[in-house]
Each structure stands twice: as structure tokens, then as C-alpha cells.
């Protein structure tokens, strides 16, 4: 990334400060990266398996965003072993210039794609719950596919500067090869900071601030609609009301907690070129930035749990799918069992009961508008 925590050395604006004593954890950070890699590949792989395992007829527009989000996170986490090695070797890149460019590019493409997919999913939930009739045509599967394609193209274009400017080099008085952003092809040594600040601030605006505002707005109106609806319901609806509202809060808060420290510290550090922070504060930013990066990366392995397993219907769908694979339920994977597993993506379908794999009939719940709408409709 142009400002992703792997370019810790050689910043022009901090050259007057002494960082001789600064060393990030050579064991903790790689361990976190590997843990995120393991959880992310498993979780996102399970999400993709479940989505594509369901029957095509039962899929909804949100399934496209869910699958795309899982692909984005999966592609992101598979690059983490490279960065874990880089960090463990005390920022010595052994994989060559091309892999430096490509892995950095993939990280940024999928960071943007992941954020955009979350935003698209939030907007899809807004249409499904707040404006289900007036915007029905916008929620067709073909519209979701087109929107997802546009989001991926936009993410790929926004990440182009990383592919262009990423390079490897051995700094003076060092024997370690760094994978860093090199602006020398377009700027002088005195103006490279302007490129760094410009690209860094723009990536924060496009990759965090604007999407977060959109998500927050969508979930505000969703919560308002759900709360207004359940005021008319009896006591049995309170539990579902509390569950739906808690999911909304968890989604928004988790996204903010994972990404806000990274973007905040990154922006403050880069603004040191203009504001000339004291060396103590600048050293503090440099020390905490690698750990803020780790926290943001953790979001890629949390998404499957938050957007899938946190939803009881999706959890039952996974259980039904695995149980049917082992004991053999009636119907093919793309018929009865698949229709049950797809219930997480249908806002008005009946969820399978806990005894589904034992041959019993599904337990039907009372149909309550909106209470059957999930965040992964």
C-alpha cells in the first residue's frame, strides 16, 4: 500500500527525528497475520461454499454482495503470509519487485472492494427494508451483478497507483530490501511528500470516510423503520426487534473499530509533513501504526462471522447443509436441502427447524414483516 504500514523507514518529513530505538514486534505481528490468514481463508471459503451451494432460484440480490465480499476478503488474506514473512524478517523483502507490486496491489484492490461491497450490502438492506416496493427493480439479481462489477472495476482503478509506485530497494546504511512506495519517477525528493499525502488522504476518504457515512445513513433508516414497525407488535416481537437492532449496531461499530485507528493514525502521520509533529508524537504514531494495521486486517476474518454466522438463519443453513451431507437428507443439494440452506437469503422464507436432518418437518415461525428480513437477505 502507499501508506500501509510496510513503508516505515525513510520518510522525508521525519528525517530529523531519531528512530534508532524503534522496532515493531517481530513475532506478534506475523502471528496475527497468520491467524487472520487461517481464519479468513476458512471463514470466507465457507461463506462462498454456502452461497453457491444454495439453489439459484432462491438467491437474492444481497447474495452477490456477500459472495463478492467473501472473494475480496479471501484474496486479501492469501497475501498475508508474504507480509508476515516480511515483518518477521524485520522488513526485509525476499520475494522480488514484481511480487512486491502485485501483492501490494491485491491488498489495495481487495481493501477497496471489501469496503464497497459492505456499502453495497448496506444499501441493498436499505432498499429491502425501508423502500421494498418503490425500489424493487433495483434489487433484481442482474442489477446486483452489474453494481458488483462496477465496484470491482472502481477498486481496481483506485489501486493502480500502488502497482505503479511500489518498488524494492536497499536503503543506505542497510542490508535489507524494502518494499515501499517510490515517487521519484513523478516527483523530486522535496515534493514526494505531496504525493504521499495526496494519495493517502484520498484513499482514506474513498476507502473509509465516504463508505462509512453511507453505511451509517443506511442503517440509521433501517433501524428507524424496524423500530417503528415493532412498536405495533406485541411482546413476542421484542426479542426479534432487539436481535435485529443489535446486529445493525455490531456491524457498524465493528467496521469503525477495525478501520478507524488505521486511517486516523495513517492520516496524522502523513500530515506530519505539513504540521511538523514533535518527534515524540511522531515516534508514537510510527510505533502504533503496525498494530493499527493488524486491527484493520482482522476485519477480513470477522466479516464471515458478522455477516453470516451472526444471523441465526444462516447458522441453521450451515448446520443443515453439513448435517445433510453426513446423514443424507431427502433431495439433491440443489433441491430441498439447498432451498433450506438458502433461507438465510430469503426475507420471507421459513427457517429450517433443528430436527430437519432427523427427518422431521421444519418448524414454521409466525410470519412477521421485517422481523424475517435479515441483513443478508
Curated annotation (Swiss-Prot):
Disulphide linkage map: 17-279, 100-179
Residues bearing carbohydrate: 13, 173
Cellular location(s): Cell membrane
Start-end of Low complexity biased regions: 335-349
Extracellular side: 1-28, 85-97, 163-196, 269-287
Subunit structure and binding partners: Homodimer; dimerization inhibits APLNR-mediated G protein and beta-arrestin signaling pathways compared to monomeric APLNR.
Residue spans, topological domain Cytoplasmic: 53-62, 124-144, 222-244, 311-377
Record-linked PROSITE patterns: G_PROTEIN_RECEP_F1_1, G_PROTEIN_RECEP_F1_2
GO molecular function: apelin receptor activity; G protein-coupled peptide receptor activity; G protein-coupled receptor activity; mechanoreceptor activity; peptide binding
Chain ranges passing through the membrane: 29-52, 63-84, 98-123, 145-162, 197-221, 245-268, 288-310
Species whose genome carries this gene: Rattus norvegicus
Role description: G protein-coupled receptor for peptide hormones apelin (APLN) and apelin receptor early endogenous ligand (APELA/ELA), that plays a role in the regulation of normal cardiovascular function and fluid homeostasis. When acting as apelin receptor, activates both G(i) protein pathway that inhibits adenylate cyclase activity, and the beta-arrestin pathway that promotes internalization of the receptor. APLNR/APJ also functions as mechanoreceptor that is activated by pathological stimuli in a G-protein-independent fashion to induce beta-arrestin signaling, hence eliciting cardiac hypertrophy.
UniProt site positions, description: Required for APELA and APLN/apelin-13 interaction and signaling: 83, 166
Protein name, as recorded: Apelin receptor
UniProt record similarity statement: Belongs to the G-protein coupled receptor 1 family.
Amino acid at each position: 500500500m502507499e501508506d500501509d504500514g510496510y513503508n516505515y523507514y525513510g520518510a522525508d518529513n521525519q528525517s530529523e527525528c531519531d528512530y534508532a530505538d524503534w522496532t515493531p514486534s517481530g513475532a506478534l505481528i506475523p502471528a496475527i497475520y497468520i491467524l487472520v490468514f487461517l481464519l479468513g481463508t476458512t471463514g470466507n471459503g465457507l461463506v462462498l461454499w454456502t452461497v453457491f451451494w444454495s439453489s439459484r432460484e432462491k438467491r437474492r440480490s444481497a447474495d452477490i454482495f456477500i459472495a463478492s465480499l467473501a472473494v475480496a476478503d479471501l484474496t486479501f488474506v492469501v497475501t498475508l503470509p508474504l507480509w508476515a514473512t516480511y515483518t518477521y524478517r524485520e522488513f526485509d523483502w525476499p520475494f522480488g519487485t514484481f511480487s512486491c507490486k502485485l501483492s501490494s496491489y491485491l491488498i489495495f484492490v481487495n481493501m477497496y472492494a471489501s469496503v464497497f461491497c459492505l456499502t453495497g450490502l448496506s444499501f441493498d438492506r436499505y432498499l429491502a427494508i425501508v423502500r421494498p416496493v418503490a425500489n424493487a427493480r433495483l434489487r433484481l439479481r442482474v442489477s446486483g451483478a452489474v453494481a458488483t462489477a462496477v465496484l470491482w472495476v472502481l477498486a481496481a482503478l483506485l489501486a493502480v497507483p500502488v502497482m505503479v509506485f511500489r518498488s524494492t530497494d536497499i536503503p543506505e546504511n542497510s542490508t535489507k530490501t524494502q518494499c515501499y512506495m517510490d515517487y521519484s519517477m513523478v516527483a523530486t525528493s522535496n515534493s514526494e511528500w505531496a504525493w504521499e499525502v495526496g494519495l493517502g488522504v484520498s484513499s482514506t476518504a474513498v476507502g473509509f470516510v465516504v463508505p462509512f457515512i453511507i453505511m451509517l445513513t443506511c442503517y440509521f433508516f433501517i433501524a428507524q423503520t424496524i423500530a417503528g414497525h415493532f412498536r405495533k407488535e406485541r411482546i413476542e416481537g421484542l426479542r426479534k426487534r432487539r436481535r435485529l437492532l443489535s446486529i445493525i449496531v455490531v456491524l457498524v461499530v465493528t467496521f469503525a473499530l477495525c478501520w478507524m485507528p488505521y486511517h486516523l493514525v495513517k492520516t496524522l502521520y502523513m500530515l506530519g509533513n505539513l504540521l511538523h509533529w514533535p518527534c515524540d508524537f511522531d515516534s508514537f504514531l510510527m510505533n502504533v501504526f503496525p498494530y493499527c494495521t493488524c486491527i484493520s486486517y482482522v476485519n477480513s476474518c470477522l466479516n464471515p462471522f458478522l455477516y453470516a454466522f451472526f444471523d441465526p438463519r444462516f447458522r441453521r443453513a450451515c448446520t443443515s447443509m453439513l448435517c445433510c451431507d453426513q446423514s443424507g437428507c431427502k433431495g439433491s443439494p440443489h433441491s430441498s436441502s439447498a432451498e433450506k440452506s438458502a433461507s438465510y437469503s430469503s426475507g420471507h422464507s421459513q427457517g429450517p427447524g433443528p430436527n430437519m436432518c432427523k427427518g422431521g418437518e421444519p418448524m414454521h415461525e409466525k410470519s412477521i414483516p421485517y422481523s424475517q428480513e435479515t441483513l443478508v437477505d
